[in-house]
Amino acid sequence: MNQPFDKLLDARGLNCPMPLVNARKEIARLEPFQVLKVVATDRGSVADFQGWAKVAKNVELVGQDTEPMGGVSVYVHYVKRVA
């Protein structure tokens, strides 16, 4: 997936719930309609980001993907701040 983004958050090596905790902090620093790209190695982050996007009123999950990076699969999440 080649989604444009405004800021990158590297959450590789962090376990649940830290990728989501750090993403929430970063998304608060973005302007509305900017996109945060999060890369994580925690498989559970896929469901975590989906759940967050369903309940949060200020974010939209615009894409998710799995990419190889350094011999490891990383989970990539694109989150847009909408408010």
For each predicted feature, which ranges?
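Short, compositionally biased "basic patch" segments
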Residues: 1-4, 80-82
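Amphipathic, hydrophobic secondary-structure cores in small proteins
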Residues: 17-59, 65
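Short secondary-structure boundary/capping segments
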Residues: 1, 28, 67-69
